Amino acid sequence: ESFRKLDVLLSRQSFRLSFWRAATEEINYRRFFNVNELICVRVEQEEVFNHSHELIIHWIRQGKITGLRIDHIDGLYDPTRYLMKLREAAADCYVVVEKILGPGEDLPTCWMIQGTTGYEFLNAVNEVFCYSAHKSKLTGIYSRFSRFRTSCEDLVAEKKRLIAGKHMAGDVDNLAHLIKKTAARYRHGSDMTLHGLRRAIVEVLVHFPVYRTYMDRETCRPEDPVYTKEAVRKAMWTLPELANELQFIENSLLLKFWDDLTEEEQKDWIH
């Protein structure tokens, strides 16, 4: 009886308690990677931003804080607009972001910040302790000892496929439903299946060369379309039977609308 009453009480909450592994296959919120407890705060909403930043901004204006470290900036819905709002509220504050930059990748120039927290610097420091001329020798020793012959590139792709397809299946499923809902309105996408879209999404994620892109109707780094096309091209090479799904995903990511879309339909596409 006591458990029944507890269940009634918990069922009245605005959240549902569940076994933590359920989120692998079914999830309705954004989180950091696959860590269920690190729930994303929707700071893209004005009310949420103001409420969650009120004390921080108050301390900045009092001179108690002179710098901010923005953790996991890429987990936000719209990092660029977030940083614009933050800069409006804290014009003279020193701001750095935790950002994983791929080889040759630069920060978006429209971000009004002082830089990153320094991961790329740590990578450079690590290279000081690694004599690259002996790479082939070390690789040979490792291969003979482990009897492991898979290349680094193939191993990365294999593990990305495992993480995206299994440990983040719920997130992929949500994306597949969103894309299918949009695609079903048009003759180009009416026959796409959820299964095919799931496979296509995972494969694009596997081949994506950077952590994320920053594209909307107003801002876009010149390199972002290049990253997107590269990922889709490689995905088409491994899954040629899903060329239609992959092309639709590319058009969605690049905001290439069909000519007959209404303004409301274009907003849904962007979402």
What residue spans do the PLM features occupy?
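Alpha-amylase-like alpha-glycosidases and glucanotransferases acting on alpha-linked glucans and related
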Residues: E1-G67, L76-H271
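Conserved Walker B
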Residues: I73
